[in-house]
A protein has these predicted regions:
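Amphipathic alpha-helical interaction elements
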Residues: 2, 37, 54-57, 110, ...
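A metal-dependent, Asp-based hydrolase signature
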Residues: 6-90, 97
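C-terminal cap/substrate-recognition subdomain and adjoining C-terminal extension
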Residues: 68, 74-223
């Protein structure tokens, strides 16, 4: 929906505020570079960056992170891809319920959702006690099957099958962590996918789209 990572933008802003453990923040960016360079797997990168993110924000009040997230979003909201607002309206017009699931922290995912008027949104959830982050992670959608877990938690169900019309649902994703959702819906769309997801999409016969074609593609598949 927006170039880059909102979660990493949040980390950068925390550091500029003099918040967060710098050694853990630096390690997060280093692990991402290692994964992109083929040194470690995607799942190993997610596991390590999740641990590091939780450690980086340990001891920070949740209200402070929410304030920083709002500042980050204020500076990034203009970078939303032009298709995003029309896409949300198209989804609603077809009688579908828009839901956002992201691996970024829910504090900033909520900013995105509020901007789009989307009531159902999930992000990574870090442990809190007495209004302060504890250094643990309760939910990471980027983990294997993590986005399915996030959807179940968001919708308050033990299983999506039977609670959601999966065959009548559409999912859009670009990361390997999105595959667990794409493979269970009736209309999966790989949007400008990373190479691993592109290969999977080709093998499964899923639609592959990009920012220039997406609205036309949605108009076709949701007709």
């Amino acid at each position: 929906m927006i170039p880059g990572s909102l979660g990493l933008g949040l980390l950068d802003r925390l550091r500029s505020w003099g918040l967060g453990a710098p050694e853990h923040i630096d390690a997060i960016f280093a692990e991402i570079r290692r994964q992109r360079g083929g040194v470690i797997s995607y799942n190993d990168m997610v596991a390590e960056t999740t641990r590091r993110f939780a450690a980086a924000i340990r001891g920070i009040p949740t209200s402070t992170v929410a304030e920083v997230a709002a500042e980050v979003w204020s500076g990034r909201r203009g970078a939303l891809f032009p298709f995003v607002r029309p896409m949300v309206e198209m989804i609603r017009a077809r009688g579908l319920r828009p839901v956002i699931v992201s691996s970024s922290p829910r504090e900033i995912v909520r900013c995105l959702a509020a901007e789009l008027g989307v009531g159902d949104a999930a992000g990574s959830i870090f442990g809190v006690e007495d209004g302060v982050y504890t250094g643990t992670c309760e939910l990471m959608p980027g983990r294997p099957q993590g986005k399915m877990a996030a959807l179940r938690r968001l919708l308050g169900v033990d299983a999506l099958a039977g609670a959601v019309d999966l065959a009548g649902s559409m999912a859009l994703g670009n990361a390997l962590s999105d595959a667990c959702v794409l493979e269970v819906v009736g209309t999966p769309i790989a949007f400008e996918p990373v190479p691993e997801l592109r290969a999977l999409a080709i093998s499964r016969g899923w639609m592959i789209s990009d920012r220039a074609r997406l609205l036309d593609d949605l108009d076709d598949v949701l007709a």
